[in-house]
Amino acid sequence: MQRLWIHLSFLFAVVTAWPEGLQAQVFVNASDAYNITQYNWDGHYGSGITLADWDNDGWPDLTFGATSGAIRTWRNLGGTGFEMIPLPWLSEGEIKALLWADFDNDGDDDLFVLEESGRCGFLEHNGEGGFQLVQNTKEGDSQLPQAETESGGASFGDMDGDGDLDLHICRYVEFSNFEEDGNRNVLLRNDGGFTFTNVTELSGIDVHMRLSFQSLWWDFNEDGHQDVLVINDKNGANSMFKNLGDGTFVDVAPILGSDIVIDAMTLSLGDFNGDGWQDLFHTNTHFGGDGLGSKLLVQHENGFFSEESANHNIALDEFCWGAAWMDVDNDTDLDLFVAEHDGLDPFGLNFLWENRVVENLATGQTSHLFEAFGEDVYGLDYLNSHVVASGDLDRNGWVDFVVHNVGNHKARIWMNGGFGNGHTSVTIGLHGIVSNPDAAGAKLTVHSSSASQSRIIHVGENYLSQESEYEVFGLGNDTSIDSVTVVWPSGLVEFFDPAAHELAPGGFYVLEEGSSLCTVTHQIQELCDFPSDVASHDGTGLFDVTWTQAGTLWEGLEEAPEWNTIDDAPWTMSLSWQDVSLCETTIGVAFYPLPGDLDTNGHVGVSDLFLVLEELGCMGTCNADLDNDHTVSIVDLMAFLASFGDTCGQ
């Protein structure tokens, strides 16, 4: 099945019908209503979940990992329910990573699977809803390592900017007597067709041997190269591997201040304070090294991080695991869900925190403080929870989330019925053309009168999870969108004008790379020549075209003027980026003859004089009839001599 790319808006219209009496609470567990029963009975540290839309119909689907049996995915039936589909992968151990993306760039999403033992592979999507195990996933063919070593999560990003997704795998091993290469984190370069090259040692990303739980790709310094972040348990500091652009990486976490040593359980990235810089949230246990409690690393304009959890009332001293940033109340700032499970004290209480903007009346400055939502929003639910992922499952404009547990607790599907506060939202997905199709690594920003909100697109994040690729941006009380900006992994920066693309609150859109409409300033050109004589001209020097987008000049792009050889057709000017046509406009050209230029060579000269003399006395239709009286006479000769020496364009 080919992707369905939606460029026009449509209103959220399909809403799940709930039984009477269930709407008293904002979030309602709909797993029973959807007839979805999923356990992770013998789970160790949790199993992966994903809300990726693998059939590309615009509705997030659900896929759960477990410790045994076939992987099951639930296909979203347009918000009315889910259809369970078993996949051809029999689990031999707890599944840590389930990640959907178009790994072979054929237009449909495939599935990557990683088990805790290190067993991993791909399920290829045939485009019609069927899947088959990729057979070349044994080490030596695709270079996917099958080492029997304890593994954590995984993530995909484009390390070399070639448009396909490369793979990072976390290993959960730190003992010195197990220092074989197979026990270190792995970096695999995608060579196409589900074939990978192991570049771990060459890249320098294997310098540490730690208890790595999760990785994430993010161009943190915005130099055009996707970097790799890794969180570690126990004694190993977290890492931030800067991509040097030549296939190698260097850990700069000690320089930037993100090398904290805790029992880091989640790698959750989000701009919680709306300053344009992405921040990091890490959960922790009671035994963390650099102080107890969760950690909030706030990124500053200079690229450095500072730990400020206490300043924002989010130093949570509990045994916590996965977390997810999401704007559940659509007020333009990110709220936070945190999953809890203490093996020594089971049945923990998960947390849903509201991000509140508080103003200091004395100074006029504002700060963001987190406070737990009341039970009217999210009720008490004592679970052994590990993994969370979010997305708008029923597309009602309010983000939902799914929690995966261990033991005898089945997964929760928390549906957001809305806060009744009048707030709106807009949902946007991306599709790459020059960039990887999933736009992994892209920076998506929505500007409205109240806020500018930026999100980074990931394939693998938080803890063992993959969020929906459709980002829900709360707009508060704003009734319009000012603009949408996309920084694509290819390096292209596009500005999408809401009026031109009909972007509005309450809408759902998928923006395709290269589809932004651009404006062009030009003047109608007048040429004293004929189309037949300029048809071979490349256009250079004839027109002065300035391409602009949202008032910003586009630089470094390729201008390609082309002549349309159809009679009387205008010039076509196009703007391209790496062979992708971004914009096109036509320029009207008014051709007029140069008086006396009878041979149309652009100059009135002796050759034209001979033609006038030859036609003296001609009556009717005559080329030398310059006064249009149907006769070539001395009057025409005098008119010709008045133009003698003229040249086209002068």
Regions found by a protein language model. Give the residues of each.
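Gly/Ser/Thr/Pro-enriched helix-cap/hinge segments flanking short amphipathic alpha-helices
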Residues: 34, 38, 304, 359, ...
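Acidic carboxylate motifs that coordinate Ca2+ or other divalent cations, activating on Asp/Glu
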Residues: 57, 61, 106, 110, ...
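Cellulosome-associated attachment modules in secreted, modular CAZymes
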Residues: 49, 583, 588-650
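Solvent-exposed segments in extracellular or luminal domains encompassing
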Residues: 559-570
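Hydrophobic beta-strand segments that make up the repeating blades of beta-propeller
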Residues: 59-66, 111-115, 167-171, 228-232, ...
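Beta-propeller blade termini
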Residues: 45-56, 75, 95-105, 124, ...
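Blade-edge motifs of beta-propeller repeat domains
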Residues: 24-44, 75-93, 124-149, 186-210, ...
